[in-house]
């Protein structure tokens, strides 16, 4: 005989899938469900937990349990979806410049004529060729930060760099402190490697470091993952005081710092990176996707010497080495000034797109940074982000909800709007459609 709670789960699942309970419907409270179904409160909680695991509902602390929009995949915004040609992509950031294709053609011609072309057919050192690591180290040198080429490891993009850091230095069950809203790609890594993410509350200016201090006093935290320069999705840039405080706290509690600098090169005059305040315990990860091109999968891990062998071993276990065809191309662009030129142009492009976003979304509670390629848009108290995302998809506009970025129990009703993928002339009309949809959702 089927367990009582299973029958309740099946009945609700059928009602949701058939549309009898439409997206956005608020379900009864746990106590009301328990009383109505004549089950215990613990069983009612189990019913909702199973429905949530099935991707049918989402529970939000303080608000209740709601039916998810089944036309959107769970975690909308995490998994790269195939976007139809007629869809305006405000979900992912693929910032590119018109002249980059011609520059790539010329770079490939130059590479083909280089004298060491045969070397690209052979295995290379796991961390990359030392000459290229030296070029990258000099490129990343800035105020208070001059990495040694020996500590630079070339990887297949910043995401691969994060994966190698996690794989090499952390173990299943380790507690990693992260912002309550954080980069969705790190959440995916944490799930794959069975890490426990502990959410640090977010303030407008950055993470609540007092809350991190309290967490470290109460639990054995192994590491902290941080995006101090152009945080994704909130766009903040931590000031020097916050960076020093984070470094001090990490020393006090012997934390590994994983500094994600994927967007850092887009900021004109950023503060010194966190690694400059705690070089002995910080792994610095960056790449060339956001400042150059997402398809050129070259990333960089800068590691303290004591951690380097473990990260290098992880590279060996996964990709052996980064293809030198691509790393050579990037290094040639660094040396001839192409990277610097593209970075300057990308900063200008991001600022122009932010200006358009500020103009179109004026009056809405937008959270962002002038150098960022995305904005965070909190919604009204009664608004439903999944319903709004679906309404926009019906208009052929793709956006991300807050769910992929959220680590805490309470999922905010908000949208992350990426500005970098659409042609500049298409951005304003797309954002006008977003504004119209948001206003309709608020006053429906």
Placement of each model-derived feature along the sequence:
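Conserved core of the PLP fold type I
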Residues: 119-253, 264-283, 440-442
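N-terminal basic, amphipathic alpha-helical segments
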Residues: 1-112, 116, 121, 312, ...
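Short beta-strand "wing" residues that participate in macromolecule-binding interfaces
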Residues: 58-60, 147, 399-400
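Short Gly/Ser/Thr- and Asp/Glu-enriched loop/turn motifs at secondary-structure junctions
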Residues: 62, 148-149, 368-374
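Hydrophobic residues in well-ordered beta-strands that form the structural core
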Residues: 178, 199, 257-259, 330, ...
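PLP-dependent aminotransferase class I/II
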Residues: 284-369
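Conserved active-site segment immediately N-terminal to the catalytic lysine
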Residues: 270-289, 309-312, 415
């Amino acid at each position: 005989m089927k367990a009582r709670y299973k029958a309740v789960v099946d009945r609700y699942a059928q009602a949701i899938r058939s549309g009898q309970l439409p997206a956005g419907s608020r379900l009864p409270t746990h106590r009301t469900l328990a009383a109505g179904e004549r089950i215990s409160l613990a069983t009612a909680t189990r019913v909702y937990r199973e429905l949530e695991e099935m991707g049918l509902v989402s529970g939000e602390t303080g608000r209740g349990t709601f039916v998810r929009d089944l036309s959107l995949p769970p975690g909308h915004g995490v998994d790269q979806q195939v976007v139809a040609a007629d869809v305006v992509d405000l979900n992912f950031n693929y910032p590119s410049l018109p002249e980059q294709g011609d520059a790539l053609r010329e770079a490939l011609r130059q590479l083909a004529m280089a004298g060491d072309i045969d070397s690209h057919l052979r295995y290379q050192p796991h961390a990359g060729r030392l000459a290229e690591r030296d070029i990258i180290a000099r490129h990343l040198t800035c105020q208070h930060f001059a990495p040694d080429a020996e500590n630079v490891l070339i990887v297949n993009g910043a995401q691969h760099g994060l994966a190698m850091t996690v794989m090499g230095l952390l173990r299943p069950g380790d507690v990693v402190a992260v912002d309550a809203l954080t980069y969705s790609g790190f959440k995916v890594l944490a799930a794959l490697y069975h890490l426990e993410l502990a959410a640090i509350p977010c303030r407008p200016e950055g993470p609540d470091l007092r809350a991190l201090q309290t967490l470290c006093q109460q639990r054995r935290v192994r590491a902290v993952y941080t995006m101090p320069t152009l945080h994704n999705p909130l766009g903040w840039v931590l000031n020097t005081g916050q960076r020093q405080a984070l470094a001090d706290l990490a020393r006090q509690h012997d934390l590994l710092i994983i500094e994600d600098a994927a967007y850092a090169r887009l900021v004109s005059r950023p503060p010194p990176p966190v690694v400059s305040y705690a070089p002995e315990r910080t792994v610095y990860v960056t790449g060339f996707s956001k400042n150059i091109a997402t398809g050129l999968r070259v990333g960089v891990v800068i590691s303290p010497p004591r951690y380097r062998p473990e990260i290098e071993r992880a590279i060996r276990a996964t990709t052996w080495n980064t293809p030198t065809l691509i790393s050579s191309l990037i290094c040639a662009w660094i040396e001839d000034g192409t990277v610097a030129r593209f970075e300057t142009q990308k900063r200008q492009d991001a600022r122009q797109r932010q200006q358009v976003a500020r103009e179109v979304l004026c009056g809405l509670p937008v959270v962002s940074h002038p150098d960022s390629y995305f904005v965070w848009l909190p919604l009204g108290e009664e608004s439903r982000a999944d319903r709004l995302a679906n309404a926009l998809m019906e208009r052929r506009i793709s956006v991300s909800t807050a769910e992929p970025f959220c680590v805490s129990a309470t999922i905010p009703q908000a949208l992350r709007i990426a500005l970098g993928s659409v042609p500049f002339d298409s951005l304003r009309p797309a954002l006008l459609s977003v504004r119209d949809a948001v206003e309709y959702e608020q006053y429906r």
